[in-house]
């Protein structure tokens, strides 16, 4: 449903590819920090997850 609203996958990939060349250093740093934050949160969730006891 989201893809239909935003366009096809090819269009999104093409836009992302074109935008990568135009990233300012500040925006690039922000994206990198965001990705690292998400990875860190996923790792913590995986490491701290436990089976519920019945």
Swiss-Prot record:
GO cellular component terms listed in the entry, alphabetical order: plasma membrane
Chain residue ranges for the region called Required for DVL/RTFL small polypeptide activity: 20-51
Keywords tagged on the record: Cell membrane, Developmental protein, Glycoprotein, Membrane, Transmembrane, Transmembrane helix
Domain of life: Eukaryota
TM regions (residue ranges): 31-48
Listed GO biological process terms: negative regulation of cell population proliferation; shoot system development
Any Pfam family matching the protein: DVL
InterPro entries in alphabetical order: DVL, DVL_RTFL_regulatory
Topological category with respect to the lipid bilayer: Single-pass membrane protein
The keyword Phosphoprotein is annotated on this UniProt entry: no
Residues that carry a glycan: 26
Record's subcellular location: Cell membrane
Protein's UniProt keywords contain Zinc-finger: no
PANTHER family named in the record: DVL19-RELATED-RELATED
Role of this protein: Small polypeptide acting as a regulatory molecule which coordinates cellular responses required for differentiation, growth and development, probably by restricting polar cell proliferation in lateral organs and coordinating socket cell recruitment and differentiation at trichome sites.
Family as reported in the entry's similarity comment: Belongs to the DVL/RTFL small polypeptides family.
The name this protein goes by in its record: Small polypeptide DEVIL 12
Organism: Arabidopsis thaliana (Mouse-ear cress)
